[in-house]
Amino acid sequence: MIINIEKTVSNAFHHKHPVDCRVFYEKNQYGMSAAKFDRFVQSKGLSSIDGQWKEISYAEARSIFIDLCSRSLCYGTEVMPTSKADFLASQFFKYFNKQESKYFTNFILDSYPSMINIYKLHNYASCHSLLPTSLLSIGILSVNTEEIGLFVRGEWD
C-alpha cells in the first residue's frame, strides 16, 4: 500500500539523517493546471510554491523518485540500496501511472541531466521547499483527471 512506501523510506533514514517522507493521495478536484496544485499541497499542510511546478516525463519522475529514496539530499551518500528504491518507485507508480497521467516536480531546473544526482542539485537547480520545517524538500506530483498523488521527502541536515 501507499503508506508502506512512506514508512519504508522514513525507516531507512531513521538513524542516519533527520528526514520527513510523506505520500498524499485524493480524488482530483483541482484540474490539470499546475497553478492549482498548490491548493492540494496546502490542504495537506505543506507549503505553497506559488504554482512553480515543472512538468517532467514519467522517466524523469521515476528517476527522481529513486534518487530521493536512495540518496541523502544533503550529502549525496547512499542511504538505501537502489534496488529497494526501484521497488518503492514501482509501488508508487503502480498507483499513479495511468495513460493520461502527467508528472510535476518542485525543481526549477537550469539544466536537467539524464540521471539526476541529488547531491549536485545545487549545481543544476534551485528548489521551492514543500515541507515548512525542512531545509530541503523535493516532491513528485502525479496527476490525471481522476486522482492526484504526491511523494515528498525532506531533510534538515
Question: In which residue ranges do the predicted regions lie?
Answer:
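Long, contiguous N-terminal structural blocks used for assembly/anchoring
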Residues: 1-105
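Acidic, proline/glycine-rich low-complexity IDRs
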Residues: 94-157
